[in-house]
Every structure is written in C-alpha cells, then in structure tokens.
Amino acid sequence: MSHQTGIKANAELLKFFGKCKDGKTRVLKVSIENEELRLVSHSDVKRDWEKDYDTLVRPLIEESTPCYILYRLDYKIPTGYAWLLMSWVPESATVRQKMLYASTKATLKLEFGSGHIKEELNATSKEETTLQGYQKHKVDFNTPAPLTSREEELAELRKTEVKTDFGIDTKQQTLGGINCPIADAVAQALHDMRRGGYNYLQFRIDLEEEKIHLVKADNIELTGLPAQIPTDHARYHLYIFKHHHEGNYLESVVFVYSMPGYSCSIRERMMYSSCKGPFSATIEKHGIQVAKKLEIDNGAELTEEFLHEELHPRKLNLRPQFSKPKGPPSRGAKRLTKPQAVE
C-alpha cells in the first residue's frame, strides 16, 4: 500500500531517523502533514522503558488526531536497540485518515529501518496506548485465539493425518490452501466494512511478498461493480449486495474470486486459488459473515439477476411427473358368446 500513497519522510525526519538510533532517544512522534511524514516531537531516555512509557507516551496522544509513535525498548537485537511502532488511529478519525495511516505505515517502517522494529501495536482507544494496554496486547497476541467447532474438527483431522504412514501428509495438509498474511490496511478495511463504512473492498496478493494487500475500499452501486473487475490480474472482492427476497430486505456479503482466464501467470493462478479458502475464513474471523462465494472470469457476470439467483436459487421440483396412461380405445359393448357344442 505504500506504493499507492506516495507519502515519504521529509528531510528533517530522515536525518533524525539516523540520529535517534544512538541509544539516547526514547520516543518520537511522527504524523502525516501536507502529504509527507514529519517529525512532531521527541524525548530522550529518562529511566527504564517501563517507567518512561506512560510519562512520555501519554502527552503525545491527541484525542482525535492519528499519529505514529516509535518507542525505544531496552533490549538489544543485532541491529541495536529494539523499537516498538505504535499506530494511533482513534475510532473518531475520518475514513480517509484511517486509510492513509494504514497504507503509509509500510513506508515509515522502510525508511526508519524495518530491522529495528521488533514489535507493533495498533491502538484505537487511549487505554491501548498505556503501558497496561501494551502489556495486555502482548498477552493477547501470544495467546491462541479460541477455535470454532469447525476449526477444532479440522485440527483433529490434521492430527490424524500426521499420524498416518501413507506418505501423503503434505498433500493432505495443503488441501485446505495457503494462509497468506494480510496487511494492516486489509484488517482496517474489514473492520470499517463491518461498521458500515464501505460496501465494496478489493484485495490483491503480492506474489513476491506472498501477502494480501488492500487495493480499493469504496461505496459503489451494483451497476458499477462489473467495472471493478480487472481484465489482466486476479483479485479478491467483497461486496454487500442489498436486495429484497420474499418480502425481506437483505444485505448479503458476497466474496468474489476473479481470474481473467489464462492471461495471468501460472504462479498467480495457483496463489489465488490456494489462498482464497483461508482468506475467506480470515474475513469471517473479522466479523463479516460471507453469504456466498463466487468464482468468475468476467466482470460482466455480476448482474443483479446473477447475484440474486446465486444467493436464492429457485427450488426445482425434482419428482418426475408421469401422466396416467390412456386406456385402450373403446370397442363397443362386451358380448357374451356360448361355446359351441361338439358334435
């Protein structure tokens, strides 16, 4: 997503990035102003990192203004001290601000030095920006999420597969697909869609990074949906189809996997095909219930009639109807005949 915003650090910030790694700087605040990353303020190390945390971070957090906080921790890694990157994007921020900060974070990490950033925190409430909030985030991050009944069944199935001696474990375990990681902007867009911010999202897989990124988040009419489907690359799409069925108003979320024939490379086709199952599961983990999953090769297929038929297929009476066979044609009244006597 950093390639889409074009926002980069200004000269002052780049210069400070080189200086702040000398071990004396504890925290710095960076914001997006006038389409560039700017240094807002910074503070030096006072005490150990836990005692400095609330004292130095709290004054930097403004109620409704997003920013990035880079906080130096006290343990070292091969490149020097480890740093925490906090993205402060409050719920009250505008949709544009949320998108901008989510999609620019990769650029910030690159220009600061990704190797120095060992921990990340996305904060949307002031409680999450405190030391207690950070510690809770660490606990939650390291605790496995509870499994649904379906996930528990799959976990048990995998255990069974691993114990078999047929030599086909790898193949069986890959039948579920490849679980590609998602960019922060993807998670934010899913969160915003669940809250009613968008009715359409488009995603792409970075084949080199093997990561799913957000391409577009918008509100579009159904008539404009076909035009969103690329003709040269595969994509994933989420669309909220608003319609009526049997007198009820429905808002059904449709997951669309578009693959424009053989104009895509073999690797691209394989990646999108393998990742679609796990990615749709990730979408549902973010609170979006997918009503229908579709695969198309042409955007023209996405008409109102098509979506309605896919969501509510007509019930067909499969019982064969046989007409009662007609009786033989009438041959008049029956006649009784007496057997002739044998002479």
From Swiss-Prot:
InterPro entries: ADF-H (IPR002108), ADF-H/Gelsolin-like_dom_sf (IPR029006), Twinfilin (IPR028458). It is found in: Cytoplasm, Cytoskeleton; Cytoplasm, Cell cortex. GO terms for molecular function: actin filament binding; actin monomer binding. SMART domains: ADF. It holds the Pfam family Cofilin_ADF. Signal peptide: none annotated. CDD domains: ADF_Twf-C_like, ADF_Twf-N_like. Residues 314-343 are annotated as: Disordered. PROSITE patterns: ADF_H (PS51263). One of its GO terms (biological process) is barbed-end actin filament capping. Keywords: Actin-binding, Cytoplasm, Cytoskeleton, Repeat. Residues 4-139, 177-312 form the ADF-H domain. GO terms for cellular component: actin filament; cell cortex; cytoplasm; myofibril. Actin-binding protein involved in motile and morphological processes. Inhibits actin polymerization, likely by sequestering G-actin. Interacts with G-actin; ADP-actin form. Belongs to the actin-binding proteins ADF family. Twinfilin subfamily. PANTHER family: TWINFILIN. This is Twinfilin. The gene is twf.
